[in-house]
């Protein structure tokens, strides 16, 4: 992944990586840290191999499975609280139709999911993480970024097709459930 460090632009506003390529995730998170920009990890199981990247990420957004893999706890809120004990970044767990939980000053804060008719969940997590990264890059605070990302994922789930169902920024901003 050494080549990735050289290939990273210097004018980034955020980085997003997942745990499937631990070396690449580490480079992306170190770049974010060095540039003082958000570094978001899509923490999907198995997460152990990406532990160094998780330690320096500014935002660790676990799936339920990723949070359970990291902590051994199946309850998203308890897993988030436990993960926050060993990670310095903002800990978030996406929990599908139940919403998203994040840890703020040691307390679990839930963001409710939109009530929609689900058509297809393929790529919903990827849409959520990408929208979250875009929102942080745009300067939104974590709460608003989570809401923006959750809206994007809800729109995607209400449509068929994986990435073809991903909404535009305008669709997310104009959405009302």
Q: Can you say where each PLM-predicted feature lies in the sequence?
A:
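Conserved phosphate-binding/catalytic region of the ribokinase-like
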Residues: 48, 75-177
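Ribokinase/PfkB-type carbohydrate-kinase core domain
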Residues: 1-108
